[in-house]
A protein has these predicted regions:
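Nucleotide-sugar donor-binding/catalytic module of glycosyltransferases
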Residues: 1-10, 17-46, 52-318, 329-332
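Acidic, serine/threonine- and proline-rich low-complexity regulatory regions
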Residues: 331-339
Length: 360
């Protein structure tokens, strides 16, 4: 096991072979990397019951330090995150959505806002919200060094024909900057959990996973509660589970891969995209904290209006056809995945026959 120790403390202790130093025991390594600490491996350690109120830690370990077990941590990397927001007539929620991003403590990101032919004022409100953010940034502008000039954070793309969320996200890929490392999806009626959401994401990206599954919360009747924390142990559990687009951060090269693009012109577009992403990923990590808030109070959301939306029934049929196509594409490559897709085909076919949707 590897744990962290402050470098200055090490310098004090290493001259005395009999000297012990206290080490953080239950802090994630990713959290400590940002502090530019060093770490060491240990063999014989004992628990020390002491309350370190300054660090909010109740239990720490102590260990003898030697030069042999001294290891330097890898450099902390600030990955650029491309946040994709599809929008259609969400003038009442888009400001809250964008504000939750602009207030982030982690700032190495860009937003691709793709409007799917809205007829309301959502584009105007998005521009006004961004302008308000820019004015705040300019208030801290350093006229001498010019080091504080805010970078462009928001790109607005207006579609010329209706493509729904899947098409909007595919279009967004074409507008991502070349230096974007990962993509994350935020719906225009939802928002990020708190101001450290992107910081938490970047800490977990230090191991360079293809996919990072994140925790979700839901907002309903004025209350926010945690509703989904990923617990996948392997690729098969991830495929068999279901994480909507907003439940994962994906390496840009994987998300934009031809085989992993969204189906367009249909609802439920993220179900098969999830399967494809999980099939082609080589590694993943879990962030067992809420990062995203799913707004279940929104009367216009897809899942809320599914019973009266004429697209819902046709999308169930389309989903069955897309699942069949996915099964035929992947069949024979992995026996466990074959069985999962076969059972999924049966389930979706039953949905078509019963005009229902058991997944919801």
């Amino acid at each position: 096991m590897t744990i962290a120790v402050d470098k200055n403390s090490y310098q004090v202790a290493k001259d005395d072979e009999n000297k012990y130093i206290y080490l953080y025991e239950d802090e994630p390594l990713e959290d400590l990397m940002k502090t530019k600490l060093h770490c060491m491996e240990y063999n014989e350690c004992e628990f020390v019951d002491i309350n370190l109120t300054d660090y909010n830690i109740d239990c720490i370990k102590k260990c003898k330090i030697t030069d042999k077990n001294w290891i330097k941590l890898p450099e902390y990397v600030e990955y650029k995150i491309g946040i994709i927001i599809p929008n259609y007539n969400y003038e009442h929620t888009i400001e809250k959505c964008l504000e939750s991003i602009f207030k982030q403590t982690y700032t190495n990101y860009e937003i691709i806002f793709v409007d799917d032919m809205s007829t309301d004022n959502s584009i105007k409100i998005a521009k006004q919200t961004y302008l308000k953010h820019i004015k705040k940034e300019l208030a801290h502008f350093d006229y001498i060094s010019k080091l504080s000039i805010p970078k462009e954070k928001l790109k607005i793309v207006q579609l010329k024909q209706k493509r729904l969320n899947g098409g909007a996200r595919n279009e967004a890929y074409l507008h991502l900057s070349d230096d974007v490392d990962y993509v994350y999806y935020v719906d225009s009626d939802d928002w990020l959990y708190d101001e450290n959401a992107l910081l938490e994401i970047n800490r977990k990206l230090q191991s360079k996973p293809d996919v990072l599954f994140v925790g979700l919360a839901e907002y309903k009747n004025g209350k926010t509660k945690i509703c989904d924390i990923p617990e996948y142990k392997d690729k098969y559990e991830a495929i068999a589970g279901w994480s909507g687009s907003c439940g994962k951060v994906i390496k840009k090269s994987l998300a934009t891969r031809q085989e992993c693009l969204y189906n367009e012109g249909t609802l439920k577009e993220d179900k098969n995209q999830h399967c494809k992403i999980c099939f082609y990923m080589n590694s993943f990590q879990l962030l067992k904290k809420p990062i995203y808030v799913w707004n279940k109070s929104n009367y216009k959301s897809v899942t809320t209006v599914r019973k009266v939306n004429p697209l819902w029934e046709t999308s169930t049929i389309r989903h069955w056809a897309d699942t069949l196509q996915l099964y035929l594409e992947l069949k024979g490559k992995d026996e466990k995945i074959d069985k999962f897709l076969e059972s999924r085909l049966t389930m979706v076919k039953q949905e078509v026959l019963n005009n229902g949707d058991k997944q919801w």
